Structures are given as C-alpha cells and as structure tokens.
Amino acid sequence: MSEHGADLRFDSPEKEIKHWKSKVADMQDALRETESSLQDFVESSKELEQEMEKELSASNKTISDLKRRNEQLSGDLEDWKSKYSRALSEHNATLTTLQKELGQLRESVDIYKAKLRDTELTNDELENAERMVASSLADMEGKYNKTIEKTALLEEELIEKTRLDEENQRLKDELREMTEEMTILRDLVTRSRAISRADTMASSTYDDSTAPRSEQSFDSSPIKPSSAARATERPSSRQALSSPVTNRVPISRRLGAMGHNRRLSRDVRAAEAPSLAAVLDDSPTATTTSAAPTRSSTLSRRDPLAATPYHHGASTSHGLTSSPSARAQLRASVRAAARIGGAVSVSSAPRSTNLSANGGAAGSKRMMAEMISKMKALESRINSAKDLSRVVGPGDESAIPRPSSRMATIGSPSANGHNSIHMPTSTPRAPRASMDGNRTIGSSIPVPSRVRRPSSRMSERGTPPMPSLGLPRAQTPSSLHARGSSRADGPSPLPLHEFMDHDPASTLPHAARYAAAQASVAKRRTSMSGSGMSHSASHGSLAKVRSGSTLPRSTTPSTVAAPRVTQSSMTYYGAEASMSKRTPLSTRLASSHRNASSARGSINGPPSSWKTSAMPAQTLSRSRSSSLGSETETF
C-alpha cells in the first residue's frame, strides 16, 4: 500500500481519506468473505475428517483383516513351501532311483542283446551242426546199409562155403569109399571072369559029343577076348576116374539132374530116388535081351535098363541120390553083392563041371552087367563131382540147391483190423534152365520174377544234403529222412520223436529190399565165379549204386538184402511199384526249402514241414519187417 500510496498523489486529504475508507471497506468485505470461506472450510473439513475417520477405521479394520489373512496365507505359504521342498526331495530321490533303474535296464537290454546275438550265433552253429549231423547221418546210413548188404552177402557166401566144404568132404569120403568098393568090385569081376572062363571051357569040353547043344552053349557063353583085348577093355581105376565113356550124357545135364534130385529130396522128402537113365550107358544085357527105348532129351524116370526084371530094381536102388540113407543102402547093396558074388564064385568052383552051360553063362553075364553098371554109376558121380566147379559159370543158372524162401511179409494191422500176412504156402516154382540150355527142369527153388520192381531210395538218399542245395535253417533230418512228397498226393514224413530211435534199415520200401535179393544173388554168382569167395565185384557194384544209378532201377540194392523172393510177392510189389512215382532228393529238398522258407527261425514250435499232413483217401499200405519191429509204409 505504501508503494501504492507512494505512487498515489491526492489532491486533497478528503480524497485521500475517502480513498482510504473505500480501501478499508473493500478489505473488510474480503475479510468477511474469507471468514465465511473459512467457516465453510472448517465445516467441510470437519465433515471430511469424520468421513476420513470413518474411512480410516474401515481401512484399519481392512488392514487388520488383511494382516490376519496375510498371516494365514503366510502360514499356508510356509506349508506349501515345506510340501514343495518335500515333494522336490521325493522327486529328486525318485528321479535318481529311476535314473538308476534306467541305467540298469539299459545294461540289461545290452546284456540281453548280447545274449540274443550269442544265442542266434549258437543257433546258427547248432543248425549248421544239425545239417552236418544230417549229412553225416545220411552218409553213415548209406555206409550202414552198404555194410548190411555186404554182411548179408558175406553170410550167404559163408553159408555157401560151409555147405560146399561139407559137400566136398562128403564127396571125398564117398570117393574114398567108392574107390575101395571099386577095388573090391574089380577083384570080384576078375575072379568072376576067371570062373566064367573056366566054366565055359569045362562046358565046351563036356558038350563036344553033342554038337548042337555045344554050339548053343558056346553061343550063349560070353565071348572070351584075348589078353590084350581084355587088358584094353578092362577099365582101371585111373581110366574110370579120368576117361569117361564117350556116349555119356553131358555133364551139365547130369549136374542139373543131381541138383534136381537134391531139391526133390529136400522139399518132397520122398523115398523114391530118380533113375540113372541119363547117366548109365546101355549094358550088354539091355541091348541083347530087350528092346530098350531111346534116350529122350529130358530126364525121365524110365531108364533103358528097366526093361529087364533085374535092372528094374537096380535102377531105383543104385540111382544117383544125395540122401545119406540112399548112399548107405547103395554101399550096403554093393558090399552084399560083392560078398554074394565071392561066395558064388567060391562055391561054384568045385561044382563047375556039374553046372549047365546056359545057367553059368547067364549068371556070369548078369553079374558082369551089374558090376559094370555100378562102376559106371560111380564113375559118373566122381566125374560130376570133379566137374562141378568147371561147369557152373557166372552166367549159368545155379545147380547148387539153395534153401527155400522162409520170408513172410508180416505187417501192421490194416484198415479192416486184420494183420496183412503173406506166407509163401503155395509158392509158384519157375522152371530152371539146365546147364547145356536144351531143356528145363522143374525146380523147387523160388526164382525171382523178371517183372520191374520198385526202385529203392538208396540211389536218391546216397547224396547227403549239403548247404549248396538250399537247405533251410529250420530243416531237420526227419524231413530229409522220410519225405515222400512225390510218392502220393501228400507227404508222409517221419515224426520227429521217432527219428533217432528209428531203424534206418526199415525206412526203405519192402519191395526195394526184395529187389536187392536179385542183385545180391547176381553179385554172389559173379564173386563165386571169380577168384574164390572174393566179393570185390559186389562191393564195386554197391559203390556204383551209392554214387549214381548205373544199375537199372529194378536192381538197385536197398538197405537189407533179403535172402530169397517168391514170384507172387515180386509180382505183387511190382504191381504196386507202377502206382508210385519218385523224384530225386535234390528236387524234394528244393521244394522243401521253398515250402519251409516261412518257418525259418520260428520259436512257436517245429516248422510245418515236420508235421504229418493228412493222407489221401486212397492209399496203398505195404508192410515191412525191420529189426525193431513191424512198421507200415504208405504210398
């Protein structure tokens, strides 16, 4: 105001007072306004303070509530923190445990992988070993079959050798006895000729007075040859053994007759022996007293000496027999005749002048004819025994008697419940050709028929299964051993549990074993005709059969060589062989490899190739006998 007052200049003091009064009035108005404003402000501030107190009390209450809530939440937080820490520790422990277990499982997986790898390697090695064992088994089976056949051949040869040794010893004994009998008979013939000569001279001297009767007696007496002629005509023991009569029947025919007689004596067991029609020559009595029939080309029971009553009995008693009783009767009759002849010669010496010429001449002729016939029979037997090894050739039919077939096909029960048994009760006999080939002799030995027989599986199974054939991993020896997929509509393998305890000799067909009989007989004859009893030829032929099919399929040897085969059985199995067809082993192995490729490495059991498939409705059952028992093989 001072500044305003200093700046203000009044004209008069009244104006100055007036001015200052107006100023005071303005200031008082401003004061009143300010006081009213203050009063309003105080009132508003009181209201505001009340409201603020209310708000403060509410805020304090809220704060207390929030604090209490905060404390509660803090406690919950601590609880959750402890729970979290505890869960975290548990999680860490669990994680550690799981990590340890994971490490262990990884180690176990690695170990199992290594074991699986080792197992697979071992499995591969075992399968390789199994294939090697299968091939070795097939090889050993082939060797076993070959050994069986060789053993059968050796047994047959040993039996034949034993029989021939016995025959040789018997013939030696008979030769010695017959030599002694020939010596006795020769002395007897010499004495009888001297006695008959003395009787003839005495009768001619006595009958000189009656010329017609003396001529008749002289004609009826035997002609007296000179000493040189008698020495020429009288056969010595060496001539009887080495110089047979020229008009004798061929030795092959006599050997055939001997074999036929032996077979008749063995099979028929008849007491009647065949005659000596093809062996003995015509005697002087037979040519002078009877019209003897001519000899036929075949052996018959009629002999030229049977025309007279005397030789009818001699033809059967002195025949060429092989039974011991007949030989003993022959020797007894010869000794009895020798004793009777000696007694007659001794007793007729003092009475030679009293005997009539006709009776003495006829008796001496009969005695000489009988002795000559006996000597000729003995000579023929000795010559036949000496020429036995020379006549029997490798290509000839054997004249040696063989044992009859004792085989019987005994099989397992058939479809109708009965056993299929084939016994050779009425075995047909094929005619056996003689050695000289101009006639046939009915034989009692069963001859194998010439029909085509089923081939064996030895030529197919001789090659062992090698890895080059594509043998599957799951292939087993049973599928190699008994697979016959091409033999019928379905395969018929051998079960697995029967493989190791199964006889390999019985796996082959029965007819194939029969087929080995003919081959074994042929090889036996070949080995007999060679150097002694060697069987190198048969072993070579068996090796050929093992290595390849050089022999025809009808003569392929099998596991077991049967001794003999009847013709009816061979015809039956030959008819069965035409109903089955065979395929090589390599083809069957290739097909089995293709079929069993899906079963490689299977762990659920054996592959499908091991399992026996359903057999077709129409099957042919053929029984076979083995060393382990009877089994049935189906086609």
From Swiss-Prot:
SUPFAM superfamilies: Tropomyosin (SSF57997). Residues 35-63, 200-267, 279-328, 389-504, 516-635 are annotated as: Disordered. Residues 43-56 have a biased composition (Basic and acidic residues). InterPro entries: NUDE (IPR033494), NUDE_dom (IPR006964). GO terms for cellular component: cytoplasm; kinesin complex; kinetochore; microtubule. Required for nuclear migration. Belongs to the nudE family. This is Nuclear distribution protein nudE homolog 1. It comes from Mycosarcoma maydis (Corn smut fungus). The lineage of its organism: Eukaryota, Fungi, Dikarya, Basidiomycota, Ustilaginomycotina. The gene is NDE1.
